[in-house]
Amino acid sequence: MKRKIIVGSRRSKLALTQSNWVINKLKENYPEFDFEIKEIVTKGDRILDVTLSKVGGKGLFVSEVEQALSDEAIDFAVHSMKDVPSSLKEGLIIGAIPKRESPLDCFVFNQVNSLDELPQGSVIGTSSLRRAAQLLKHRPDFVIKPIRGNIDTRLQKLHAENFDAIILAKAGLARMGWLENTTLKLEDIPPEVCLPAVGQGALAIECRESDQQIRDMLTSIHHEETGICVEAERVFLKKLNGGCEIPIAGFATRANEFVQFKGLVGNADGSIILESEQVGANPSEIGNKVAEDLLSEGADTIIKELRNV
């Protein structure tokens, strides 16, 4: 009799699309298993009338899923890596990180077709302090207005609430199949304008450390280069004790065995943005070094002030 593998997922269309993508990849290698998705509602899904930075805490989109893993109600979980706290619940590990989608943020415009065409005082929809701070540094005239909900909800609000543009993760649009043959007015935001969130574009497949069968299975869809880059980013995040209440960004690439990593911390209005970039062979060392650079420049003061607001 086939073992049935229970996969934990949030119930948004994007989360279910991501979970089904992982399942289909695993079925290619393990056709002898059956897979079933268990939908789980998280705190972040329930609280939609408050920005995430004001809700506070870590793991807003993963805590309930991790609890189901610990309780053995599910066998593994599929998360967006950028939602996963830098420290996992005891007994749980990241079993695999598949190949990364685009890490970039992108504009979805209401009327115009590019950032340069947005008029003075344009209203931009984002609830991300990271995106808001970097965008305000680039265009202090912008008015940032919070927007919550899943991708389809936010796309509806673009027109219904008269935003000039909203910002979404390009990876989500790609996974939903909305980049091809789309009527959406899209433009990638280069990292020089808006450095991505730690882990953005990557998936995290979390499992119990003690479940060797699942761990062996997940190894088949792990992408080494993505895993190395994400390691540098998450070490950086952990060193700074970052969360969604801090404008913090980090993005690593790898070429010729070397990791290039850039990290950033800023204040809420983008008037202070601290940046550092390092290159090296060891992703953990590089992530730590960039964090230490920013701390020496005063990142700890910014973080303390934001947490006391």
From Swiss-Prot:
The modification S-(dipyrrolylmethanemethyl)cysteine is found at C244. Signal peptide: none annotated. Its EC number is 2.5.1.61. Gene3D superfamilies: Periplasmic binding protein-like II, Porphobilinogen deaminase, C-terminal domain. Pathway: Porphyrin-containing compound metabolism; protoporphyrin-IX biosynthesis; coproporphyrinogen-III from 5-aminolevulinate: step 2/4. Keywords: Porphyrin biosynthesis, Transferase. The lineage of its organism: Bacteria, Bacillati, Bacillota, Bacilli, Bacillales. One of its GO terms (cellular component) is cytoplasm. GO terms for biological process: heme biosynthetic process; protoporphyrinogen IX biosynthetic process. Belongs to the HMBS family. CDD domains: PBP2_EcHMBS_like (cd13646). The gene is hemC. It holds the Pfam family Porphobil_deamC. It comes from Listeria monocytogenes serovar 1/2a (strain ATCC BAA-679 / EGD-e). It is an enzyme of class 2 (transferase). Binds 1 dipyrromethane group covalently. One of its GO terms (molecular function) is hydroxymethylbilane synthase activity. This is Porphobilinogen deaminase. The porphobilinogen subunits are added to the dipyrromethane group. Monomer. NCBIfam families: hemC. Its cofactor is dipyrromethane. It catalyses: 4 porphobilinogen + H2O = hydroxymethylbilane + 4 NH4(+).
